[in-house]
Design a protein with these regions (language model features):
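Extracellular/virion structural assembly segments
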Residues: 1-309
């Protein structure tokens, strides 16, 4: 049954235009908006960067939706003609429980499947929707305790487990280039090797969000996006190496809706920019006999036991 799966401007897409969305066609609707790259100071003699995150802003989104129609049915031109009318068009998908206001920016690329024809349209979402007043959910019912915390909140609270990330976390950043000079009649170059400092680095975590219902999924989805785009730097704590990294959200990619039946399962990649990263030895922090780190009375800082000359 293809009726009632997609509504465009409150019109049933199958009944009125003879089209439906192909399997996997929902994936393009899911990615978080990308963050506009913030202004930054990149001091040549200091590790990392100082980004201006006082007021993070989001980029408009562009996305593809692939439709299918019967070759013997109505022409795809009916849908394209409707979407070519001025203004935005409201896409509502009942099974996802959400709607999007989109603008057509590219007409179809066609692909024949015997008795079916697939065509892909590209849309813009000019004003991505920011979540507002989102409480942190208890989405951990279907995922194990997380080794990662975002601003002190374990990712399993958002229903998220990180399936790959250790190699990305431990990968060393590139070294900043110091002052150098070449002389025409001298081999090689003269390089200031007096100090080694590191660039910031991008880290991509492969994630899986699992929820018991679409309502819970959107609650976790909105809460995670809201947490990522708050003003200021984020803090990513990694349990397996007892390190906390200053960072900020950049983008997501590779969203795939794996399951809508029973549990909702979605996989995606989360990319963060680590503003400062240096692996320069062992840090010693005060802990209890049970291995729990001791924090200061205000709950903001660990107690450093390193000896500094």
């Amino acid at each position: 049954m293809r009726e009632g799966r997609l509504y465009i401007d409150n019109r049933d897409a199958y009944i009125d235009f003879g089209v439906w969305i192909t399997r996997g066609g929902y994936d393009g609707l899911l990615p978080f908006p990308e963050l506009v790259e913030p202004d930054r100071n990149d001091w040549p003699d200091e590790d990392g960067i100082e980004p201006d995150l006082e007021k993070p802003t989001l980029k408009p989104r562009e996305l593809n939706i692939t439709f299918v129609r019967d070759v013997d049915g109505r022409s795809a031109g009916d849908l394209v003609e409707h979407l070519s009318k001025s203004g935005y068009h409201l896409f509502r998908i009942p099974s996802l429980g959400r709607e999007w206001s989109l603008r057509l920016i590219q007409s179809p690329a066609y692909e024949d499947w015997d008795t079916l024809e697939a065509f892909t349209l590209r849309f813009a979402e000019d004003q991505p929707v920011r979540p507002s007043s989102v409480a942190i959910p208890e989405g951990r019912a279907y995922v194990p305790p997380s080794e990662y915390e975002l601003d002190g909140v374990p990712l399993d609270r958002y229903g998220v487990m990180v399936t790959e990330g250790r190699d990305e976390i431990m990968r060393s950043p590139t070294v900043k280039t110091n002052l150098s000079r070449t002389v025409l009649d001298v081999d090689g170059r003269i390089y200031d090797a007096g100090k080694v400092v590191y660039n910031s680095k991008e880290v991509t975590l492969k994630c899986c969000l699992i929820a018991g219902s679409m309502t819970t999924f959107w609650s976790c989805y909105d809460a995670l996006l809201d947490a990522l785009i708050q003003p200021g730097e984020r803090s990513l704590y990694v349990d397996y190496n007892v390190e906390e990294y200053p960072c900020y959200y950049k983008r997501t990619s590779g969203w795939k809706l794996e399951s809508l039946r029973g549990r909702v399962v979605v996989t995606f990649n989360l990319t963060l920019e680590f503003t400062v990263f240096r692996m320069d030895g062992v840090d010693y922090l005060l802990a209890t006999e049970a291995g729990e780190l001791v924090v200061t009375e205000d709950g903001e800082y660990y107690i450093d036991l390193n000896i500094y000359a």
